Amino acid sequence: MHFDLVDMRLFVAVAEARSITHGAERSALALASASARIKGMEAALGVPLLERQRHGVRLTAAGESMLEHARIM
């Protein structure tokens, strides 16, 4: 599993905004690209990082752990 700096910065932005849309905007990425990157991270890890809700997202336990590691980078 390999994530680049763009992936990690995007994940932090999404987690802090609690929104893929706003995280994508903060990262200067198209929504479709940001969503695909997050889904790719989840697929590579084999666990969901986000719980997608009607209005935004919430971090799963795995997402909380990933956020700690992503902030270090």
Give, region by region, the residue ranges found by the protein language model.
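C-terminal effector-binding regulatory domain of bacterial HTH transcription factors
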Residues: 1
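The N-cap/first-turn positions of alpha helices
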Residues: 4-7, 31, 63, 70
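Short helix-boundary/capping micro-motifs
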Residues: 12-31
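Residue cluster at the C-terminal edge of the helix-turn-helix DNA-binding motif
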Residues: 17, 26, 39-48
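Short alpha-helical "packing" element that flanks the helix-turn-helix/winged-helix DNA-binding module
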Residues: 7-14, 66
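A short LG(V/I)-centered, amphipathic sequence patch enriched
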Residues: 42-59, 64
